[in-house]
């Protein structure tokens, strides 16, 4: 393996440090994205759980004879439909286990319709997937689907939490867009890489200037100066056959010993 030059020896740890910083930046960005996603998941779960608790309380009143069951169901559907999430943008859709929409506050036109054949922008059967989550052993879970943001044409990814409310065997679902998490992640990566590029360029310039100054003072690579010193110590003052000594700048160590 050929010996590294002084410049290479100075730049090698610099490159290593920059790569380590890049790896750390990527790791932190991935961690931040993961935590943001988990926080979004928990918020959706808490929101749907609160609706399920509300339904359970109303169902308990009906079971106690305080309300006729049909009136209790209508009350539960209406009150769940009034719940809001994420500053009013999020809501809960109530669906029967056979994919008939009881109440979708954002799209009341589909209330009462069987949506089993509905597909999202990516071709996924959303309501079938909701029913499958509700019918699972856990009775709840997360799913994703694609839907345009208000006023947008292109679909964006939404994270949803679905849960089967056992009081009247309804499926409840709430969703929130998560493309902002990915956008924030990409923006962080771009900013970090740009900052590291500037830092790397600055440090490389400093390393180059330091190396240039040291090489000018020595008159060449330290290995050449060491070879000259070894020859002098051995009594050889010819200095012939050594590469890198012919252009030693005036005032350098190598130029001085060549006189």
Report residues per predicted region.
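Polar/charged heptad-repeat coiled-coil helices used as signal-transmission/dimerization stalks
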Residues: 4, 34, 38, 49, ...
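Extreme N-terminal signal-anchor transmembrane helix of membrane signaling/transducer proteins, especially
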Residues: 4-31, 193-203
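N-terminal membrane-insertion alpha helix
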Residues: 18-42, 58-62, 183-187, 191, ...
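Extracellular/periplasmic ligand-binding regions of membrane signal-transduction receptors
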Residues: 41, 45-78, 107, 111-113
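Extracytoplasmic/periplasmic sensory segments of membrane signal-transduction proteins
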Residues: 61-105, 125-128
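Membrane-proximal, non-catalytic sensory/regulatory domains of signal-transducing membrane proteins
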Residues: 82-93, 117-167
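Helix-start (N-cap) segments at beta->loop->alpha junctions
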Residues: 148-152, 174-184, 190
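Short, hydrophobic beta-strand elements of compact beta-sandwich sensory domains
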Residues: 157-182, 253, 257
């Amino acid at each position: 393996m050929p010996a590294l030059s002084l410049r290479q020896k100075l730049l090698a740890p610099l490159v290593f440090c920059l790569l380590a910083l890049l790896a750390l930046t990527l790791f932190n960005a991935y961690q931040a994205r993961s935590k943001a996603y988990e926080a979004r998941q928990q918020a959706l779960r808490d929101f749907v759980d609160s609706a399920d608790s509300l339904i359970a309380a109303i169902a308990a009143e009906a079971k106690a004879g305080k309300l006729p069951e049909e009136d209790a169901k209508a009350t539960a559907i209406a009150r769940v439909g009034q719940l809001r999430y994420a500053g009013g943008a999020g809501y809960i859709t109530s669906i029967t286990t056979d994919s008939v929409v009881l109440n979708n506050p954002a799209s009341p036109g589909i209330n009462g319709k069987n949506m089993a054949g509905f597909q999202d922008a990516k071709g996924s059967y959303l309501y079938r997937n909701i029913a499958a989550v509700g019918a699972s052993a856990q009775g709840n879970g997360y799913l994703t689907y694609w839907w345009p943001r208000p006023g947008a044409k292109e679909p964006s990814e939404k994270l949803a939490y679905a849960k089967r409310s056992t009081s009247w065997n309804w499926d409840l679902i709430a969703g929130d867009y998560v493309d902002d998490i990915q956008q924030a992640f990409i923006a962080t990566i771009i900013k970090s890489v740009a900052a590291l590029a500037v830092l790397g360029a600055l440090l490389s310039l400093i390393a180059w200037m330091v190396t240039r100054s040291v090489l000018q003072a020595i008159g060449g690579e330290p290995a050449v100066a060491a070879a000259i010193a070894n020859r002098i110590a051995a009594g050889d003052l010819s200095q012939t056959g050594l590469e890198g000594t012919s252009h030693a700048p005036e005032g350098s160590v190598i130029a001085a010993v060549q006189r």
